[in-house]
């Protein structure tokens, strides 16, 4: 079906670490998109065990990837529920994210907080969609970590090349006069 005769599609990757802020923010964005344009379909990718508890407007659905949890004592990740190693869980998550992007064929892909996802899991989907010409957006909250700490983390994770080579836009959620989270990067 030609892109012009099908509904507009937005894929959102919701970082699913501890807390509900990421899923709540993605839900708010999804609800605003379908409210603004009833021809839009939004699909949210998340590993949050709480995503199914949220109420979504018509035109929104979600794919829950296998969950992971960060161990408080070690800072390492582990599979949340499955009795498989975290590497196996991450491989499943990466494939589900990429395959969902491939099949859903979004007109826009929004990634929340983590530019490459947890352990780079969004990278294959980003490259696939970039090759197709899909606009790629990184969404960041207005208040983030200390700039020096964030710069070190992004250097270690090789984020700056991904921002330059993959993303078309970076959206900052919040009031620009309050905070500029990319200062110092």
Residue locations for each model-derived region?
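A short, glycine/small-residue-rich beta-strand->loop->alpha-helix junction that serves as a flexible
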Residues: 14-27, 51
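Histidine-anchored nucleotide/phosphate-binding helix
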Residues: 23-34, 123-129
